C-alpha cells in the first residue's frame, strides 16, 4: 500500500513507545509483556492502514494482536487511530514482516494473517511472494503446532500460486473461498481498506490453512 508521505509520522512514532516498537527483535519471546494480560497471540504481516487488525482487536478482546508494517507513513496512520482510541490488546511493529523468525520465538504465535500481499506477478519474482515456501517455513516456525494462516487476495494468480505452494508444503486446507463476498456476511468477514474499495471489481479469494504438527 502506497500513501503520501506523512511528515508528522516519525515524531508520532517516537512519542509512543508503549504502543509501537521499531525493533521487534527486542521483544522476541516476551510479546505478552506488552499487553494488559497474557492471551493467545495473532499477527498480521503487512497491516496497511489497520482497518482489519483494529476491527479484529475490537471484536476479540480475548486475543492479543500484533500489526506488522514496514512503511513509516502507513503504520503511523494505525498508531494515530490507537492514540485516539486505545486498544489494550493491539501492539504495532514498524518492521519488515518477512523477518518473523527474528521477531517471535518458535510457537509464540497462534495465527497469522496475510491480507492482499503484493502478488509479485513476474515469475522471476516468485520468491518474494509471501506464500513462497521459504516464508511458509518461517511461519511454521513461529506458529504453534497446528497453527493457521488466513490469506486473502483479489489476485487470481497469487491465489493459485498460494494454493499450490501450501499444498506442496503439506498444509491442510480448512476452508477455501473462490468468491468470499458471495457467501460471507459482514459479520463473518472483517474487511481491509483495500478489500472494501475494490471488492466490487472482482472476486476475493480466501484460504484458511493449517500447518501439520511436526
UniProtKB/Swiss-Prot annotation:
| E.C. no | 2.1.1.33
A Pfam family it matches? Methyltransf_4
Sites binding S-adenosyl-L-methionine sit at 44, 69, 96, 118
Q: Where does substrate bind?
A: 122, 154, 192-195
Stretches for region Interaction with RNA? 124-129
The pathway noted for it is: tRNA modification; N(7)-methylguanine-tRNA biosynthesis
* Source organism, top-level taxon: Bacteria
Keyword annotations of the record = Methyltransferase, S-adenosyl-L-methionine, Transferase, tRNA processing
> Gene Ontology terms, cellular component aspect?
tRNA methyltransferase complex
Q: Provide the GO MF annotations for this entry.
A: tRNA (guanine(46)-N7)-methyltransferase activity
Q: Which reaction does it catalyse?
A: guanosine(46) in tRNA + S-adenosyl-L-methionine = N(7)-methylguanosine(46) in tRNA + S-adenosyl-L-homocysteine
Give the active-site positions. 118
Q: Tell me which family the UniProt entry assigns to this protein.
A: Belongs to the class I-like SAM-binding methyltransferase superfamily. TrmB family.
**What is known about what this protein does?**
Catalyzes the formation of N(7)-methylguanine at position 46 (m7G46) in tRNA.
Q: What is this protein called?
A: tRNA (guanine-N(7)-)-methyltransferase
Query: Where does this protein come from, organism-wise?
Result: Lactiplantibacillus plantarum (strain ATCC BAA-793 / NCIMB 8826 / WCFS1) (Lactobacillus plantarum)
